[in-house]
């Protein structure tokens, strides 16, 4: 735990409120963009936001009145029991939800959820959760408040700790304590909720029969209230909160989960098991009878060090339920936390600033939800996503290093098992129970799987479809079916669908899944994989520069030195030095720190050849000077071990556990909770074998006896490198506590003479999880097993630096050459072409096929400067990424210089890439089918209405789809405090010799699924990707495939064409795309070309080529016509290639900055050329020496390696 303990003062209050709002006082259009609601239900979820669903002064963290205790000699006095908590980030609309627009037009989602629930064997919410319940309807509440039921919306705002208590009817409405608050346009009535335990002194447990008015625990003289039970509200909490948790915990008895969580809320001292012993488990053939390979695949290897589990799956099932029980306890720890972050205020969102009118605000909101769809889709499309971790596997007993059996942290693990959910169920001993469910070998993704991961909640499923309907950009994986053709072609045929009719088929959930079927995950054998997690950056601090936390503050500061200010030490860190370099470049007008990924500002600086070369000289001088000074300070002043520090450097970032940072909508909050449950169970499962080791696990009392042991081992993992917590001392606001007077009942005003007593004064608050990635690959094979050594050898080949000639356009200055080609080389275009073409120009140059008379003296000088800069950079480069802007070039150049000073050699370093989600208007009719709202009567109507939607997108704020861009300036991307998706694998290990504490590391890993997850993903072991949806500048202010296989995709083909080069790369790419995509290529725009090429300038050229072909076609665009146009353009640009040149060819290989242009040409028509020489091929003179450095003086910087 942290040494510094913070004190926080919180107010006291009820466990929740019921808000009663008039419909006209709410911004229903904006609310609908953020809500979760299906078409067949009036129940809805809304985000907890100030000035949207709660008042501006809403207090999110408080001490909840959770019960009462008797005081005094005779027990006549009452002291209120107070428990810390924070409000749940979603609110529950249980009356009037019909006024909120559905999230998706997909019909009959409740039917789909019920069918999936029955198929997978999960319990339903049938009737009241307790006996003798008396319902309080929404209409009754409205009548009591003097409001019109038809014109009123009622929703519940409840604390995270007591939401299950509301479901179990252990609360009552205190009408005497209602008050009026102001939200948005009008006044809103809110009714506080208190627990019935307030009328049962000293009862610290869940009340199983709250409607029993003669309960013996009711205090003498107390007027017992009517507990609050509402059918719709209970269904909403059951389906959207408890059932998703039950799916993640592998517990099919959903009510048992609710009962256990509610009990823990009232009994803070309970440490034993809370889930019942009769839990059922999914039957499947465990692979622990075999052995575990390095990647987790099972094989029958007699030489393996793993042994089969002797218990026939009993220990696997025991580990599963004990890990689930531990996760419930962890949820209580999180729910009792006090967090400083408050719910966001929608009126303060930066993206709404300066906007007048409803349509612009809705357009901004629609655009941003399309951005969010990028990260939501990644969680759905990745097969190792936390959403799909529904089963536990046993990898078998692993022998210790001394040859004997020993406990292993890696024995039990979660894996993706939705395809197993329909299998029969077993009891704890493995006996198969009678069940209607049968397993199926079909692993094709279906709507049932979406319903499963949503906990069978129709509102969550509708909201998830809302995002999937916006996932369109970048699905260039081959075989992408045209959904429009599918719907129109099957309109008149009898296709059995339980969810839709003909006229609603375009918006059916099955149509959405069919459209995205190529991107949906496929599940198979149980293997250990990284966990795909969803989280939020709530801090602008991250170590995501190329060298991570190299030379950090904690190492540079001198222990015990009180004379030097901390700020002075900070200025000598790598992070601060890189920031100073960016400031210097900004002063030189080379960089805009507000938009470091953009190079548009260079257009005002680079106006001709001299300014271009001056930029290169300035850039090189600034970087070398800054790096030299930085290394000198580290060595001479800080006495920093530069080489050892490099081997210990890591990229790092923290994903917050703050409940409101990821609460943009109910689905983002849902994903945060699923991520928490996944990582908590991963840690708990790692300790199960240690608890089981040497014990008689078959005993009936084993679980109750050792559940507290597992819980304590889990809590001991806090602050061990992965989960960070902080101990907070809680104090109460001054004054008496306001609560209902038990002797007067629920209609009387609140009494204000009660004293309160906190159940826990010191609260452990879970803050964040830490993700790390080592910068340098060491290749050290010592102290490793044979399997690990073999895997490391395979990695070494991937990290091996390849010595090869650098293509200028793929080198350090490639982005500048593409951006300013038209300015620097206006004549650099193919014959019969009207626009300069950098690919054609530099291809001919590097093949020595460029006629010298086409180059001026200034152009030759610039070419020589570019060649020298590129080759000098390539000579020291250990980063397997070409820069795409000045900021990336600066940080890469500086990192390479530091690597040179540290004598780094042989291996490439690990690099980070951030995929930034964006938004665009749809252009393909197939991507707007789900927005057709008019009933269709024929197949022709579908296409007509789809095209009509595309013509009026500007007036339809919901018509946005996702797009992606990439940047290697990851720290700049993390400064926007984004919502992120990435893969992590949590390693566990003991400390130094004699230290039994278990430490962990959240290793930055990958998302399986490749380009199905994101079109910009590439298979490169040296790179780590993160998908980020920026929040800064939008909703918060900005201060200061399976792992072993890889499929060939269209993006791979395009990248292959780019790498192979060629004079007319654009034509080759365009033809390839048209052949692969077909008619969809007609609607492709800049975002699509960028997704394929990951090159902004090449994408712009392709967009222009696309427009040019459309204009030249005399008939409507067709695949055949486009390919014919490409062929004609190719013939025009290559015309004259067979002619024998009579002029001199420019010799690119021997070019150097020189005033004599004749030294850089080859005489290809003179007598020294043999008659068999093919015109245009490189034939250097015999006395030509490449890279003759004899006349170049050796430059010495201010510091050399000898000095170090």
Swiss-Prot record:
A Gene Ontology BP annotation from the UniProt entry: bidirectional double-stranded viral DNA replication
Annotated compartments: Host nucleus
unnamed zinc finger locations on the chain: 497-510
Region Required for nuclear localization: start-end pairs: 1177-1204
An example molecular function term from Gene Ontology annotations: zinc ion binding
UniProt keywords, alphabetically: DNA replication, DNA-binding, Host nucleus, Metal-binding, Zinc, Zinc-finger
Stored SUPFAM superfamilies: Viral ssDNA binding protein (SSF118208)
Coiled coil residues, start to end: none
Keyword Chloroplast: no
Subunit structure: Homooligomers. Forms double-helical filaments necessary for the formation of replication compartments within the host nucleus. Interacts with the origin-binding protein. Interacts with the helicase primase complex; this interaction stimulates primer synthesis activity of the helicase-primase complex. Interacts with the DNA polymerase. Interacts with the alkaline exonuclease; this interaction increases its nuclease processivity.
Its job: Plays several crucial roles in viral infection. Participates in the opening of the viral DNA origin to initiate replication by interacting with the origin-binding protein. May disrupt loops, hairpins and other secondary structures present on ssDNA to reduce and eliminate pausing of viral DNA polymerase at specific sites during elongation. Promotes viral DNA recombination by performing strand-transfer, characterized by the ability to transfer a DNA strand from a linear duplex to a complementary single-stranded DNA circle. Can also catalyze the renaturation of complementary single strands.
Protein name as catalogued: Major DNA-binding protein
Origin species: Varicella-zoster virus (strain Dumas)
Taxonomic path: Viruses, Duplodnaviria, Heunggongvirae, Peploviricota, Herviviricetes
């Amino acid at each position: 735990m942290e040494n510094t303990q913070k004190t926080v003062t919180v107010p006291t209050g009820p466990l929740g409120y019921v808000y009663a709002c008039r419909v006209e006082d709410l911004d229903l259009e904006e609310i609908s963009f953020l809500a979760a609601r299906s078409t067949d239900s009036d129940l809805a979820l809304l985000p907890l936001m100030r000035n949207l669903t709660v008042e501006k002064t809403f207090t999110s963290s408080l001490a909840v009145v959770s019960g009462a205790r008797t005081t005094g000699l005779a027990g006549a006095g009452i002291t209120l029991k107070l428990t810390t908590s924070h409000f749940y980030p979603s609110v529950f609309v249980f009356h009037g939800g019909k006024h909120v627009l559905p999230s998706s037009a997909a019909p009959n989602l409740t039917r789909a959820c019920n069918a999936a629930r029955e198929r997978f064997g999960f319990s339903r919410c049938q009737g009241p959760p307790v006996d003798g319940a008396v319902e309080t309807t929404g209409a009754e509440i409205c009548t009591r408040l003097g409001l019109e039921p038809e014109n009123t919306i009622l929703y519940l705002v409840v604390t995270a700790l007591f939401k299950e208590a509301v479901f179990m009817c252990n609360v009552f409405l205190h009408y005497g304590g209602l008050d009026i608050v102001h939200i948005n346009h009008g006044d809103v009535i809110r009714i506080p909720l208190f627990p019935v335990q307030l009328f049962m002194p000293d009862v610290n447990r869940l009340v199983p029969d709250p409607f029993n008015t003669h309960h013996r625990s009711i205090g003498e003289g107390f007027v017992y209230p009517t507990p609050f039970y509402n059918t719709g509200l209970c269904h909403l909490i059951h389906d959207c909160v408890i059932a998703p948790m039950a799916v993640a915990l592998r517990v099919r008895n959903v009510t048992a989960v609710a009962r256990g969580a509610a009990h823990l809320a009232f009994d803070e001292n309970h440490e034993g098991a809370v889930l019942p012993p009769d839990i059922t488990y999914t039957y499947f053939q465990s692979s622990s009878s075999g052995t575990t390979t390095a990647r987790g695949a099972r094989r029958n290897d007699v030489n393996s060090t793993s042994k089969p589990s002797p218990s026939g799956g009993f220990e696997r099932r025991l580990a599963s339920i004990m890990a689930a029980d531990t996760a419930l306890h962890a949820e209580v720890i999180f729910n009792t936390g006090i967090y400083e972050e408050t719910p966001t205020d929608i009126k303060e969102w930066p993206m709404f600033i300066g906007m007048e009118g409803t349509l612009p605000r809705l357009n901004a909101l629609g655009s941003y939800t399309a951005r969010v769809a990028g990260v939501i889709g990644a969680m759905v499309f990745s097969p190792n996503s936390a959403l799909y971790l529904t089963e536990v596997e046993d990898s078998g007993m692993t022998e210790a290093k001394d040859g004997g059996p020993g406990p292993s942290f890696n024995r039990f693990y979660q894996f993706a098992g939705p395809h197993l959910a329909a299998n029969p169920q077993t009891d704890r001993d493995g006996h198969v129970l009678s069940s209607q469910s049968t397993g199926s070998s079909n692993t094709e993704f279906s709507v049932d799987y979406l319903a499963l991961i949503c906990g069978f909640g129709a509102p969550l499923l509708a909201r998830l479809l809302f995002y999937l309907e916006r996932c369109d950009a970048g699905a260039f994986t081959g075989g992408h079916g045209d959904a429009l053709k599918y719907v129109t072609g099957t309109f008149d045929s009898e296709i059995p669908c339980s969810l839709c009719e003909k006229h609603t088929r375009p918006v059916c959930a099955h149509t959405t899944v069919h459209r995205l079927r190529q991107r949906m995950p496929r599940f198979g054998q149980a293997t250990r994989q990284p966990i795909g997690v969803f989280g939020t950056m709530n801090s602008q601090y991250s170590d995501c520069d190329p060298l991570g936390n190299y030379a950090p503050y904690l190492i540079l500061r001198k222990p015990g030195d009180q004379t030097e200010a901390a700020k002075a030490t900070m200025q000598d860190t790598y992070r601060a030095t890189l920031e100073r370099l960016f400031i210097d470049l900004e002063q030189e007008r080379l960089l805009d720190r507000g938009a470091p990924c953009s190079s548009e500002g260079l257009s005002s600086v680079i106006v001709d050849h001299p300014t271009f070369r001056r930029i290169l000289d300035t850039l090189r001088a600034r970087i070398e000077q800054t790096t030299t000074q930085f290394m000198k300070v580290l060595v001479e002043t800080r006495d920093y071990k530069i080489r050892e520090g490099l081997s210990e450097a890591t990229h790092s970032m923290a994903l917050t556990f703050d409940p409101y940072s990821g609460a943009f909508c109910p689905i983002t909050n849902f994903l945060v909770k699923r991520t928490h449950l996944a990582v908590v169970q991963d840690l708990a499962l790692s300790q199960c074998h240690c608890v089981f080791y040497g014990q008689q696990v078959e005993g009936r009392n084993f679980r109750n006896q050792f559940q507290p042991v597992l819980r304590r081992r889990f809590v001991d993992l806090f602050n061990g490198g992965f989960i960070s917590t902080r101990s907070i001392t809680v104090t109460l606001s001054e004054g008496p506590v306001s609560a209902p007077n038990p002797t007067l009942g629920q209609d009387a005003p609140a009494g204000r003479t009660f004293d309160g007593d906190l159940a826990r004064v010191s609260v452990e608050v879970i803050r964040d999880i830490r993700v790390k990635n080592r910068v340098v690959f060491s290749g050290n094979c010592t102290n490793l097993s044979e399997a690990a050594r073999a895997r490391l050898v395979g990695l070494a080949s991937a990290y091996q630096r390849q010595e090869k000639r650098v293509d200028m356009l793929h080198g350090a200055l490639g982005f500048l050459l593409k951006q300013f080609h038209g300015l620097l080389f206006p004549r650099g275009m193919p014959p019969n072409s009207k626009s300069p073409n950098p690919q054609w120009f530099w291809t001919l140059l590097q093949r020595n096929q460029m006629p010298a008379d086409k180059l001026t003296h200034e152009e030759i000088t610039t070419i020589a400067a570019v060649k020298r800069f590129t080759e000098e950079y390539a000579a020291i480069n250990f980063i397997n990424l070409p820069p795409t802007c000045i900021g990336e070039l600066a940080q890469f150049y500086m990192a390479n210089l530091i690597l040179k000073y540290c004598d780094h050699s042989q291996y490439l370093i690990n690099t980070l890439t951030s995929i930034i989600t964006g938004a665009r208007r749809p252009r393909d009719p197939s991507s707007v089918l789900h927005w057709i709202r008019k009933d269709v009567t024929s197949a022709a109507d579908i296409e007509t209405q789809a095209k009509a939607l595309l013509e009026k997108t500007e007036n339809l704020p919901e018509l946005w789809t996702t797009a992606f861009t990439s940047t290697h300036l990851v720290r700049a991307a993390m400064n926007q405090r984004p919502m992120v998706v990435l893969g992590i694998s949590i390693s566990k290990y003991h400390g130094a010799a004699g230290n039994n504490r278990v430490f962990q590391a959240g290793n930055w890993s990958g998302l399986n699924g490749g380009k199905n997850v994101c079109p910009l993903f590439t298979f490169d072991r040296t790179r780590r990707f993160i998908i980020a949806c920026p929040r800064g500048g939008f909703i918060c202010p900005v201060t200061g495939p399976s792992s072993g296989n890889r499929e060939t995709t269209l993006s791979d083909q395009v990248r292959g064409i780019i790498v192979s080069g060629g004079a007319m790369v654009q034509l080759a790419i365009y033809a390839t795309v048209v052949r692969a995509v077909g008619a969809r290529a007609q609607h492709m725009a800049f975002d699509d070309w960028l997704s394929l090429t990951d090159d902004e300038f090449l994408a712009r050229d392709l967009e222009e080529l696309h427009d040019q072909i459309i204009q030249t076609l005399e008939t409507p665009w067709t695949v055949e016509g486009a390919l014919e146009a490409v062929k004609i353009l190719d013939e025009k640009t290559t015309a004259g290639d067979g002619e024998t040149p009579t002029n001199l060819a420019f010799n690119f290989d021997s070019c150097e900055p020189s005033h004599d242009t004749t030294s850089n040409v080859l005489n290809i028509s003179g007598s020294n050329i043999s008659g068999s020489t093919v015109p245009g091929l490189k034939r250097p003179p015999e006395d030509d020496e490449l890279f003759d450095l004899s006349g170049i003086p050796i430059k010495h910087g201010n510091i050399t390696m000898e000095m170090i």
